[in-house]
Amino acid sequence: MHLQQLVVSWFSLVWLASPIVAIWELEKNVYVVELDWYPNAPGEMVVLTCNTPEEDGITWTSDQSSEVLGTGKTLTIHVKEFGDAGQYTCRKGGAVLSQSLLLLHKKEDGIWSTDILKDQKEPKNKSFLKCEAKNYSGRFTCWWLTAISTDLKFSVKSSRGSTDPRGVTCGTATLSEDLGEYKKYRVECQEGSACPAAEESLPIEVVLEAVHKLKYENYTSSFFIRDIIKPDPPKNLQLNPLKNSRHVEISWEYPDTWSTPHSYFSLMFGVQVQGKNKREKKDKLFTDQISAKVTCHKDANIRVQARDRYYSSSWSEWASVSCN
């Protein structure tokens, strides 16, 4: 998120008296105040201006206080903590004239706060936002974890190399799984002009904006589609016993979601026999074909997974079939 400085002589809801104040518009009627967060920090002075041509009879209130905070067309607020944030309303004669919601974005020791999401610590520390693609179509899924269950709002924006914010469209974030201590949210994104066979020169940028009560945070991830590829598992696993042999031929098909043509977008497959005791596993066999010969014991399973043949993508989840 690029820091913006709202410097305007008249704004329908908020007018900032100082051009150096760290405040910017998140959406209509909602503003983020950026604060250095340490004991005795000076805070920020914010001047609100009521959207009315009149000068007299105006009162100001906040959802944080039952008292009248001031009178007149403008209200100066010293924002130092969350008790100073919230929704401010100007009225005249009981009628609401305008409202502004102030959120806080904390910076401690030069680092923006990351309190809302869980650090998944894979593949490295500070991995809050994770993304995967099933193919090279430009469609990908991102997800994140949070221990917070109420008063949450997420918004996701994406672009290719931050040059065209309209180039990648992301849907609405949804709760996809309740993991007990944590909630898993996900969002689907699609690059509008993706060319599966083209070499990527600029990474995709993803920005997740998170609001919990009066706290604002943002999280970013940057990647090439080729680096987040994880195919779906192979499908239609079949066993064909071989005569006079303990071996069987196992065959499978490419997942429906994988890019075509398969002659160009080829997969590598890993095949493994798993004994009745799931800890008992044979060495994995690798092949770029859609069949393999393996030894199949009673009560064992044969499982197959896939990854991009030419680029070291993540392996798919396993697909399995019983030897019985």
Swiss-Prot record:
Domain of life the protein comes from: Eukaryota
Signal peptide: 1-22
CDD domains: FN3
SUPFAM superfamilies the record matches: Fibronectin type III, Immunoglobulin
Main location: secreted
Fibronectin type-III domain boundaries: 233-324
Glycosylation sites: 125, 135, 218
Entry GO MF terms: cytokine activity; cytokine receptor activity; growth factor activity; identical protein binding; interleukin-12 alpha subunit binding; interleukin-12 receptor binding; interleukin-23 receptor binding; protein heterodimerization activity
Pfam families found in the cross-reference section: IL12p40_C
Keyword Iron: no
Subunit structure: Heterodimer with IL12A; disulfide-linked. The heterodimer is known as interleukin IL-12. Heterodimer with IL23A; disulfide-linked. The heterodimer is known as interleukin IL-23. Also secreted as a monomer. Interacts with NBR1; this interaction promotes IL-12 secretion.
Function: Cytokine that can act as a growth factor for activated T and NK cells, enhance the lytic activity of NK/lymphokine-activated killer cells, and stimulate the production of IFN-gamma by resting PBMC. Associates with IL23A to form the IL-23 interleukin, a heterodimeric cytokine which functions in innate and adaptive immunity. IL-23 may constitute with IL-17 an acute response to infection in peripheral tissues. IL-23 binds to a heterodimeric receptor complex composed of IL12RB1 and IL23R, activates the Jak-Stat signaling cascade, stimulates memory rather than naive T-cells and promotes production of pro-inflammatory cytokines. IL-23 induces autoimmune inflammation and thus may be responsible for autoimmune inflammatory diseases and may be important for tumorigenesis.
Protein's name according to its UniProt entry: Interleukin-12 subunit beta
Organism of derivation: Sus scrofa
Lineage: Eukaryota, Metazoa, Chordata, Craniata, Vertebrata
